[in-house]
Amino acid sequence: MIQNREEKRMEQNQNIQIVQYKEQSIEIIQASNPSEVDWKKLDTKLTTWVIVSGFFSEAELAPLSNYFSFHPLIIEGVFQKKARPAFEEFDDGLFITSNCVNLDEEGDLADIPVFFYLTDHVLISFLGQQCAFFEPIIAKLKNGKPRLKKMKADYLLNLLLDYQVDHYLLLIESLGEKIEIIQDGILEEADSKDIQAIQHMRYVLYNFLRVVWPMREMINLFVMDDSDFISDGVKHFYRDIHSHL
């Protein structure tokens, strides 16, 4: 069967990483498809982070979703291309929708839904494209002190959400620098390009706030919720995330 270019492109952008760790060790498994992983052989005594990057079909995700007994709403949720930050608790886990934001090549805001599914010892993250967004967190686990790897999956979720919020703040700083450049140009000699630049920045900032405020609301509700999947010793870290937004 001959694949079209779009199918080949999607396959090239698919990736599965499984990070398993405990206080003194860490192991990373790489795969291009969930069917390549023998899920039953995962050590359930270790904290496990499954990173799903790229676009997979429901059939391709079946080995993963079946092993972790995903609720149908979770399967439906991870295929959303646009999603408002939210969380929902199920019997077996906590499902969280968030957004990764960046500026594209044209300077417009690009927001990509990021989904998390948290169980007692497992965190699964879904990012709709293959990129190195979470690589700094993987590096932190590799190089971090044993105390960091001693923490469980609920703390790992905190690290990832906090990293996303830090990324928001860096983007705000970048937008601020762009605004200063535009303002300096206007002070010297305003022209039609400066007016267009201001209008574009207003558009970008408006879209940015449309992403950030729902994220802030979600984290606030998340902090107030008494979830069984977030331990008491970790809850204050989530409060810190909310205070940064």
Could you describe each region identified by the protein language model?
Residues 1-244:
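Peripheral, non-transmembrane regulatory/ligand-interaction domains of membrane transport proteins
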